[in-house]
Amino acid sequence: MKPGKKIIRVAAMAAAVVLLLGGVSLAEGFLLGEEGTGATVKVAENTSLNVRITLQGRLDAGDLIKSDEATPTSYESESDFSFRRIRLAFTGNMVKNLTYNLTIAADKNSVAPGNASNTLRIWYAWVNYKFADPLSITFGKIKLPYSRVSLTPATKQLLIERPFSTEAAKTLFDDYIQANLSLNGKLAGGTIAYSLAAADGWEPGATVSGNRVHKSGLLYLGRLELSPPGWVEKSKSDAALGKGRHLTLGVNAAAQNGIEYASNAFEEDRTLWGADLSGHWQGLTAQVEYNAWKEDYSDPSKVMKEPKGWYAQVAYFIPGVNVEPAIRYEIYEQDSNKSDTEQRTITAGINWYLKGHDVKLSANYARTEFEKNANGFLANDDKQNIFQLQGQMMF
């Protein structure tokens, strides 16, 4: 049996098992009870501390490695067990309207087997002061405000992995989660929401495009979200578990100019813009997002690079059995200034919620096809098939 067909058969069997087992929870609510909020200690009237632990165990199988040759020509099957995410989060209020978060992570650093070192590091560290709904200020190590699917917590993703294009866009300004200062607010009952931020981006000493950075301008970012009255999302989630409704249009832009190299007189500018539309009504959820970015070099030996990509995903939460089949289609053009650099990915999956997002099991099958000039294309193999199983627990 061909590897691709074998993976599809295993995925189908896993989905059938989930549906079968889900039948034991036909009663209202989740099999293991409702979602929790972690452990909270209230020190004083406006002072509190909440502690949450997140664990994501993962099995990846399929075309995970390349052939053992000087120049690989095909993909080979392999499997890999890992803890994709291990998080310990401390969140609370120091005084009224002053919120803080410190998250320690020991995530797996790569989805490829053999590259998994669960290195302990600070993931988030920020403080936020809310003056009023229209204005709050945040400083610390936190996500940069662009890309809807990237801003959504990993624990509330619809599918196990985020799209390739948005993952690539997250590296445009060095770390996606970096120290930044932002102004945020909501107007008109949340129908208008905004975020304006400034960060270092590529800073002195970092290596960008093969060159060490001497100095650079600041990175500026902005995001705007618009929702109709009565359709405002309380917090970002790919999967609302059949509750409520929302409809949100988001647009974002970012730019960092004057990234000067230390070894020569050249420099580069980087810009990004994107738009997304997301919505859900009870069990039905859908989302589409587009991002395009540019790396503009003053070095005449380098050609301006302009990647772009989009995806669309849809799912339906089935109450009673508490399962959610989902599908996503994506096109990522690695450089629109070159021909045949597209990769197309279709991902099909199913989630089984035993305690909402606190305890859930997910199974995904992803198939990617590469054009001849795209990274990932091999002489004897232009397709990659991967099957994933993941269990998530938060407490």
Spans of features found by a protein language model:
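Predominantly the C-terminal beta-signal and adjacent terminal strand-loop region
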Residues: 355-389, 394
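Outer membrane beta-barrel
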Residues: 34-204, 214-230, 238-243, 306, ...
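Sec/Tat signal peptide C-region and signal peptidase I cleavage site
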Residues: 11, 21-27
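Surface-exposed beta-loop-beta
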Residues: 202-304
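Bacterial N-terminal signal peptides that target proteins for export
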Residues: 2-12
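Cleaved targeting-peptide boundary
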Residues: 27-34, 208
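Outer-membrane beta-barrel "beta-signal"
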Residues: 219-231, 382-395
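Conserved active-site loop/cleft motifs that coordinate metal ions or position small ligands
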Residues: 289, 324-328, 349-351, 358-366
